[in-house]
């Protein structure tokens, strides 16, 4: 399991599913399945998978200081872009005389939660301003936990520990999903929400992390034909399950399928090397984090303008919104801009 370029292509696929969730109404009236839920699952599980791949044997300090230091190093890479999108939405609201539904108190509360990236912890605020940045609340908490996660599995015979941990985590997630999504249970109604809560999303990350530790021992050499057949079959099965069981399943089985799908992407010599491991998709995967942060603001602020300019050509509006988002992400991913943000501003 040495070449993981195709996983960047999968990362872009995850983003594209999220983009479809937010802009797909331009193309069809009914969604084929919950694109957004599946897309963010790919993001969380893939993050755990790659952290395990990169750091499973690393010497990582795991005290409180190290957790904050690691989290801070990650925060520096996206916080400025987060704040820019937040300010753009704030300006748009002020310019158009938007009346905040929760009044002044709610406005101040939600501004604070957005600036501090805590809005994922408070369910009523999860989609405020740049709605998609609830993900940043989750990933920041996960970054804080990473040093402890690495140490926990490194200090043990990790293959057996990982398998047991994976099974326990999956059963716990299945239980919580059933409680939340099927039974409507909520431990703190009005404050807690399952979908965007960072502690809940840590399960997705951990299943990706332990999934790598379990499956890395099964990545033996396969012929090109067998690898391609396995990859193609898994991708078809994944999307078929997304379509057929969209409303029947809770998220946990989809997480399991996502882990298996990611594993097939690591098989060398298969068709995914060309489909997802080409230079274009690798690059789009590299900028997917920036794409994620900017895309919904672009959709919300520009779709009406483009709709008028393009004479209600929905497909053209969809494609232009995607291109604009890519161009903006390219700018913020551009090395001089990244260095200015991380070395000059910070």
Region spans (language model):
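Membrane-cytosol interface segments of multi-pass membrane proteins
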Residues: 1-179, 225, 287-288, 305-346
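Internal transmembrane alpha-helix with an interfacial aromatic "cap," most often the third helix
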Residues: 144, 151, 208-219
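Interfacial loop-to-helix transition and helix-capping segments at the boundaries
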Residues: 4-5, 29-40, 125-138, 177-207, ...
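Alpha-helical transmembrane segments of multi-pass integral membrane proteins
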Residues: 205, 231-340
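Aromatic/glycine/proline-enriched transmembrane-helix motif characteristic
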Residues: 219-237
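Short, motif-level signal for alpha-helix interfacial/capping segments enriched in acidic residues
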Residues: 2, 115-119, 181-182, 266-276
